[in-house]
Amino acid sequence: MEPVSSWGNTSLVSVDPEIHDLIEKEKRRQCRGIELIASENFTSFAVIEALGSALTNKYSEGIPGNRYYGGNEFIDEIENLCRSRALEAFHCDPAAWGVNVQPYSGSPANFAAYTALLQPHDRIMGLDLPSGGHLTHGYYTSGGKKISATSIYFESLPYKVNFTTGYIDYDKLEEKALDFRPKLLICGGSAYPRDWDYARFRAIADKVGALLLCDMAHISGLVAAQEAANPFEYCDVVTTTTHKSLRGPRAGMIFYRKGPKPPKKGQPEGAVYDFEDKINFAVFPALQGGPHNHQIGALAVALKQANTPGFKVYAKQVKANAVALGNYLMSKGYQIVTNGTENHLVLWDLRPLGLTGNKVEKLCDLCSITLNKNAVFGDSSALAPGGVRIGAPAMTSRGLVEKDFEQIGEFLSRAVTLTLDIQKTYGKLLKDFNKGLVNNKDLDQLKADVEKFSASYEMPGFLMSEMKYKD
């Protein structure tokens, strides 16, 4: 049999130089590029160290103190520590809130919450995808095709933003809810640049007898730092990913109310919340098997980092940087949805320029700027959207401040101008447009400027001096 020292204690570069080389190339891409995808961030070396630890070896189906496998005494300690840190990071009273830290990521967390709270074909309402919502909130196309499992297994009716202002139309939301009578009302989104009126959501939910769930995946870091409105004041359940503005590993959490319910007309005296057992059962055994303990350990590290004064400074800077970028683009005459932002992202409406998000995303990719095409309210297709979504968390993690984001705005303006020039010369069809991207000196110059700019900032998670590909 092959000795352990041969297969089990040999470095990656020796065992699999091909994968090692691709990882090094990805490091270079991250270091030399400008990362503007709003759902991405750069996590810390400490988090990465926990992710690559021996915790990945252990199975631990069940919850601390009630496992289906032995040998979990330290895994139980880690998960309990992660849960207590999660409640502390989000300023939750442990007597009033519980949390499950086992979901593999945000979409599984959402579906586990729905499975716990609803019966198949119960009614839900979430923000429409072109209005800034998320697939898991019940999205289906204008033609009625059900895209998300949420819309397949539950009856979904979206609410929307006002097409003039870009803000959520709470009056129409209430009107729809009174007609539709959902069992669950969802607030939260993936491309909504404004804060959420949780008090209004609560009032609407109470009017129609619905539970209120917040998906704070995008803004959880801002919520933890108290730089965004607090969903825990009004919601019954709060879900989140952990790798976006929270700057942790890729994982998910479900927070739920527990203990006595506040007195309410028509409610039995002494009523208590019954979410805990339902949510724990939905996560396991209903939808998942063994938790990913390396993720839970890494999440515990990230939550410890999130509960520091330095993280609050970071979250505040994320918002300031997003505002600075939005203001710069508007100063150049570009159309920004809602005329600005109150959180970590800017949604740029390209339709007045006659461009699609696909083309701008593709050209930016070739210039080492990473952002994503995104639907804008009024779009008929998420596959050919009229905007791009731009986020501040990742580059803020590298130490950039407002003036740096104004420079990023200048790069983006150059990219859009170049996209317009190529479209004018080669045509609107994507196959024709792509021809203008080949051997383009202006594009090459923009890429060189972007990479020179980005390489001057530090990189979390790994040492640039130890990279294989430095140039």
Swiss-Prot record:
GO MF term set: glycine hydroxymethyltransferase activity; pyridoxal phosphate binding; salicylic acid binding
Binding-site residues, methotrexate: K373
Any single Pfam family the record assigns to this protein: SHMT
Keyword annotations: Acetylation, Cytoplasm, One-carbon metabolism, Pyridoxal phosphate, Transferase
Residues where N-acetylmethionine is found: M1
Pathway assignment: One-carbon metabolism; tetrahydrofolate interconversion
Modified residue annotations for N6-(pyridoxal phosphate)lysine: K244
InterPro entries linked to this entry: PyrdxlP-dep_Trfase, PyrdxlP-dep_Trfase_major, PyrdxlP-dep_Trfase_small, Ser_HO-MeTrfase, Ser_HO-MeTrfase-like, Ser_HO-MeTrfase_PLP_BS, SHMT-like_dom
UniProt activity-regulation remark: Inhibited by the antifolate drugs methotrexate and pemetrexed.
Complex formation: Homotetramer. Interacts with UBP16.
Family note: Belongs to the SHMT family.
NCBIfam families (alphabetical): PRK00011.1
Purpose: Catalyzes the interconversion of serine and glycine with the conversion of tetrahydrofolate (THF) into 5,10-methylene-THF.
Name of the featured protein: Serine hydroxymethyltransferase 4
Organism: Arabidopsis thaliana
Gene assigned in the entry: SHM4
